């Protein structure tokens, strides 16, 4: 269906070719799984952050990431999958998240979740910017909400990176985290 010379309306999965459905589903699944697994990892740091303020901030970030995962998983339900099938009943090998979000944290080092957050959030900023003009409105409509919350996440990580790098020991810890995590952020 077209509007007087405009591009076709792509409002539902049935408006897509099989190839397009497969591509959209794969893209959205990876985005949902990234958010879900990262949120799960962040919960491991709750009550272990260096300050009460940072603990609360990381809890808020984890909650936001769960919310973002829910936005993307809800979209996947349009393609016939249920939330239970996508998350709770899924075989772990069926998850399509980035290795960066899955890696265990370096034991007891706050630099690890902070640098991981920064690397992922910079990637996500670029990824979401690329999706702002998606021809599939069900993706495009979700991007703005996620972007507004991700701005807070990036600022939180940037502020902590500055604090951690304020002294030689902190810079060394951040560098160690970068040596470990950066290859997975590429």
Predicted features, each with a name:
Residues 7-29, 89-116, 134, 167-168, ...:
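Acidic/His metal-coordination segments adjacent to aromatic residues that form catalytic metal sites
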Residues 34-42, 68, 120-127, 153, ...:
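Amphipathic, well-ordered alpha-helical segments in soluble domains
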Residues 61-92, 157-165:
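Conserved alpha-helical segments that form or flank metal/cofactor-binding pockets of metalloenzymes
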Residues 138-186:
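A contiguous pocket-lining binding segment that forms or flanks enzyme active sites
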Residues 14, 18-45, 53:
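Terminal catalytic/cofactor-binding subdomain
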Residues 99-156:
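Internal, conserved structured core segments that host functional sites
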Residues 22-31, 49-68, 113, 138-151, ...:
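Alpha-helical scaffold segments that form or flank carboxylate-/histidine-based iron centers
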Residues 38-60, 124-140:
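Helix-loop segments that flank and shape redox-cofactor active sites
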């Amino acid at each position: 269906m077209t509007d007087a010379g405009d591009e076709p309306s792509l409002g539902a999965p049935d408006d897509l070719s099989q190839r397009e459905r497969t591509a959209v589903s794969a893209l959205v699944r990876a985005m949902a799984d990234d958010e879900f697994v990262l949120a799960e990892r962040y919960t491991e740091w709750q009550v272990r952050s260096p300050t009460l303020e940072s603990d609360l901030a990381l809890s808020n970030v984890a909650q936001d990431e769960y919310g973002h995962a829910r936005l993307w998983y809800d979209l996947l339900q349009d393609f016939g999958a249920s939330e239970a099938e996508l998350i709770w009943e899924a075989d772990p090998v069926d998850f399509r998240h980035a290795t960066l979000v899955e890696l265990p944290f370096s034991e007891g080092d706050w630099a690890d979740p902070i640098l991981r957050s920064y690397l992922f959030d910079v990637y996500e900023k670029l990824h979401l910017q690329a999706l702002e003009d998606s021809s599939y409105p069900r993706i495009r409509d979700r991007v703005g909400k996620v972007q507004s919350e991700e701005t807070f996440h990036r600022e939180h990580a940037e502020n902590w990176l500055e604090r951690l790098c304020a002294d030689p020991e902190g810079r060394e810890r951040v560098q160690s985290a970068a040596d470990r995590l950066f290859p997975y952020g590429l």
